[in-house]
Amino acid sequence: MIVGLSNPKKEYHSTRHNVGSWYLYSLAESYLRNFKNEKKFFGFTTSLNIESNYIRLLIPNIFMNINGQSVFKMASFYNINLSEILIVHDDLELQPGISKLKYSYGHNGHNGLRDIVNTFNKNINFYRFRIGIGRPINRDQIASFVLSNPTKKEKILIQKSILHAIEKNVLSNILKF
């Protein structure tokens, strides 16, 4: 299962905080798949077959700080453990254009990840695909920064890193689980 973290509502679609959903939309498009609204999972879903692996995709359609409900509902329904889920999210510690795959426990201060960890109530490692968005100079500006659109240059760099990850099939590194 792959989850692209985001906030709902049209006003947030182009924000830095929604790059997780940017990745999933691009991934689904590369496999000619469309998302459908699944109310029972509080999100948009589709599925792919990658290297003979059937993979479910989820973009929660609820706010970032409560998206654990959506992830937990779908994971429980399909009997998927947190350790078998790849969470795709924005990362303040990486510059735009940089993305990294990580397998670890924790949320590093990311509210979406925090809610997922708290909802599953488990201290276990899980896969994260971190997409760099950069960081504002002032710590007090983090909320407004992640909820704002990237500059044109940053958006190009972010989109290139997403397309590069899809073309290089970074998922093949974790499909063994």
Swiss-Prot record:
| EC number(s) from the headed UniProt entry | 3.1.1.29
Biological-process GO terms, alphabetical: protein quality control for misfolded or incompletely synthesized proteins; rescue of stalled ribosome
- Residues with site note (Stabilizes the basic form of H active site to accept a proton): 90
List GO molecular-function terms, semicolon-separated: peptidyl-tRNA hydrolase activity; tRNA binding
- Pfam families linked to this entry: Pept_tRNA_hydro (PF01195)
Q: Tell me which residues this entry annotates as catalytic.
A: 17
Source organism superkingdom: Bacteria
**What is catalyzed by this enzyme?**
an N-acyl-L-alpha-aminoacyl-tRNA + H2O = an N-acyl-L-amino acid + a tRNA + H(+)
UniProt entry keywords in alphabetical sequence: Cytoplasm, Hydrolase, RNA-binding, tRNA-binding
- The residues listed in the UniProt record as binding tRNA, with positions renumbered to this chain, are 12, 63, 65, 111
- What does this protein do, in the record's words? Hydrolyzes ribosome-free peptidyl-tRNAs (with 1 or more amino acids incorporated), which drop off the ribosome during protein synthesis, or as a result of ribosome stalling.
- Cited PANTHER family: PEPTIDYL-TRNA HYDROLASE
Q: Can you name this protein?
A: Peptidyl-tRNA hydrolase
Q: Which organism does this record belong to?
A: Buchnera aphidicola subsp. Acyrthosiphon pisum (strain APS) (Acyrthosiphon pisum symbiotic bacterium)
